[in-house]
Amino acid sequence: MTWDATNIFLLVANILTILYILYNDAVIPLWKGKTVLTVKLRSRGRWDGYIFVGIIALLFISNTFFREGPQLTSILLAVMGILFIYICFFRSSKAVFKETGLFYALLFFPYSKIERMNLSEDGILVIETNRQRLMLFARSEKDLEKMLAVFTKYN
């Protein structure tokens, strides 16, 4: 087993992916106070994930069976494939509402920084802060009503 640049890159990518999963699924629900509401959102760009998992699978198959590449590289590619299968197929994007703000796309946005909110006809809640625009794609009308109720209560 050799630790060449490819294997080091794959190891770092796997560690960062594990940290992302832990932060998103374990830290965010506990951080910044009590969770008031967690809403699963409609997924966007699902095909990007499928393509990425397919590329990782092709690299794994190519390295393992056709090139008979290093075993460590195959193991790291397999681990990366499993991690991204979890991210793409089993995990869904969500908005986590706390008493002081909300987590969306791994970032915390305090309610005090929200300048404007708009609701589109197709169920997209657009939240404008002083720096960026957040687009929350609600899965159902019930989820949208729950989000709006939290905003009216804590804002």
Swiss-Prot record:
The protein's matches in Pfam families, at most eight in alphabetical order, are given as: DUF986
Where it sits in the cell: the answer is: Cell membrane
Where, by residue number, does the polypeptide cross the bilayer?
8-28, 46-66, 70-90
> What Gene Ontology cellular-component terms does the record carry?
plasma membrane
What is the name of this protein? UPF0266 membrane protein lwe0739
InterPro entries from the xrefs?
DUF986
- Answer whether the UniProt record assigns the keyword Transmembrane helix to this protein: yes
> Cross-referenced HAMAP family, in alphabetical order?
UPF0266
- What superkingdom does the record give? Bacteria
Query: What are the UniProt keywords, alphabetically?
Result: Cell membrane, Membrane, Transmembrane, Transmembrane helix
Membrane topology note? Multi-pass membrane protein
User: Its family?
Assistant: Belongs to the UPF0266 family.
Q: Does the keyword Transmembrane helix apply?
A: yes
Q: Which organism is it from?
A: Listeria welshimeri serovar 6b (strain ATCC 35897 / DSM 20650 / CCUG 15529 / CIP 8149 / NCTC 11857 / SLCC 5334 / V8)
